[in-house]
């Protein structure tokens, strides 16, 4: 009993001392200084000499806590790309303190809002991060007019900020430098070690819509964008290290559709019915991975994103019978493929 009282007394003294210590201005300043240093310092999240992908947005438009809409941050050696910029993804990039100095381009798969909503935020963050020329954007036909719309919407904002901050935000660096592509397949980027091929997929009525094959030295990935199940996905994914594929979980969506109809929310019920015909479902995606003999399948653009154990089990219903080496992504999932190796490393960015 005496020992318990002694420990309790020490705890009370410690808490009181800590409280008064935190009222000290010097202590407050030091703690805040440490926070600010961590906030403003760029952080390197990628391995050297590797093909790496960080999932900066893992969900579809259906809301889910702690998840942004579709976005992948790709590092191929010393070159960086952002594939799609859905709502909330720029916040993740900012929170991870991404260094934009080696950003080659933003690449857009198609022009649905959940793939482009944060394009301006990425443009602004990289401008604030020291970019000296307009942001390079590569995308399908229609990308130029979309970028022009963003540029016009924030034109006055850019002028105000440039006039206020001067040379650190040169007005000539504001905006977008757009390259559009078309056709069934197109080489959209190439340097000594890296190739990116865009190939057409089916997300009708969205047309065009593209997937991407990215090769860095001896490593490779395919990113589906949004598509139904297609043989062309198998063709381009044949033997790649990792396939990142959008996926719709029919057991979840059909249950949500039924409940929406029962409670009289006919608009939501209709939308949930409609989306089932232009996304591959989880079982179909697993079959694509099996037929292509990929080493790892990563589900992203999750429709809907699982929120708990039960919904994840429903999301994956039928998948294990077809393909077992898969990973259900979350915001911060990091997949690294070191060059000259067969390793596939999976981590989570804090």
Predicted regions located by residue number:
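Cap/insert and terminal regions of metallo-dependent hydrolase folds
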Residues: 2-18, 211, 220-222, 228-331
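Binuclear metal-dependent hydrolase catalytic cores
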Residues: 2-228, 311-342, 347
């Amino acid at each position: 009993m005496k020992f318990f009282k002694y420990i309790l007394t020490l705890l009370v003294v410690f808490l009181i001392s800590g409280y008064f210590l935190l009222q000290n201005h010097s202590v407050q300043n030091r703690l805040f200084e440490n926070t600010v240093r961590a906030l403003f310092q760029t952080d390197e999240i990628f391995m050297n000499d590797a093909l790496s992908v960080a999932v900066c947005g893992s969900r579809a438009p259906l809301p889910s806590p702690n998840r942004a809409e579709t976005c992948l941050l790709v590092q191929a050696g010393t070159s960086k790309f952002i594939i799609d910029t859905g709502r909330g993804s720029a916040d993740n990039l900012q929170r991870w303190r991404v260094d934009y100095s080696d950003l080659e381009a933003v690449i857009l798969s198609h022009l649905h809002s959940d793939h482009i909503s944060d394009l301006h935020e990425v443009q602004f963050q990289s401008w604030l991060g020291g970019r000296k020329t307009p942001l390079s954007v590569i995308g399908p036909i229609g990308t130029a007019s979309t970028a022009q719309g963003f540029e016009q919407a924030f034109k006055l904002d850019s002028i105000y900020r440039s006039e206020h901050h001067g040379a650190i935000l040169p007005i000539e660096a504001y905006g977008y430098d757009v390259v559009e592509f078309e056709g069934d397949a197109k080489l959209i980027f190439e340097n000594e070690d890296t190739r990116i091929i865009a190939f057409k997929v089916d997300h009708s009525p969205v047309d065009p819509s593209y997937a991407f094959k990215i090769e860095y030295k001896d490593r490779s990935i395919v990113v589906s964008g949004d598509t139904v199940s297609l043989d062309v996905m198998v063709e381009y994914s044949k033997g790649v290290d990792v396939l990142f594929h959008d996926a719709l979980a029919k057991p979840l969506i059909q249950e949500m559709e039924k409940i929406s109809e029962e409670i009289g929310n006919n608009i939501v019920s209709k939308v949930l019915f409609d989306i089932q015909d232009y996304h591959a479902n989880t079982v179909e995606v697993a079959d694509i991975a099996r037929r292509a003999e990929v080493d790892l399948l990563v589900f992203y653009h999750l429709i809907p994103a699982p929120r708990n154990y039960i919904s994840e089990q429903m999301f994956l219903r039928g998948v294990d019978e077809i393909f077992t080496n898969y990973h259900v992504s979350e915001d911060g999932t990091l997949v690294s493929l070191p060059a000259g190796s067969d390793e596939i490393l999976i981590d989570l960015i804090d």
